[in-house]
């Protein structure tokens, strides 16, 4: 009795191979495991004890958990979301608003002392990760550029304010930690901009090459028909 086993086709790009192995069930399990780890009081306290770790480690990990949960959604749920998220615009607008709100220093202070706000913060970041996962590809390069053109300058400006402000903006964190976070926010905004621009150029070159190849392949057929 032969047993068939689906395997990735040789030559597939690395992200195609990753998508083949990252089944919805595995993504959902990974998301729940990550959330369980982040909920451990000792780890949560360690991440939130520093301003830079709070925003640059805990925030992205919660967003990653949300992205994994979005990957575990059934097709019907994805289609339901897509109905109100045409071209990813609604999801990206909500993401920008939530990230802007969570950069307010007062929110960080309140999250450390108020469990309800802490829960709301974590839930919002998980939803942001899911929204990004469900919105990024449908958005296309134009909407992606508009989104990053708003979020990245905001991030860099907030970071520079953290660096230049001579007083603490968060009561729970030291001035040195505030300045460190500010520098990282500026560098992160610049790095994301460079990576996205490089990806945009790569995508456009590949698209033009594919179009040219299809036109060249169509020319012999057109010639044969004329003959």
Place the predicted regions along the sequence by residue.
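Alpha-helical membrane segments of multi-pass proteins
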Residues: 2-227
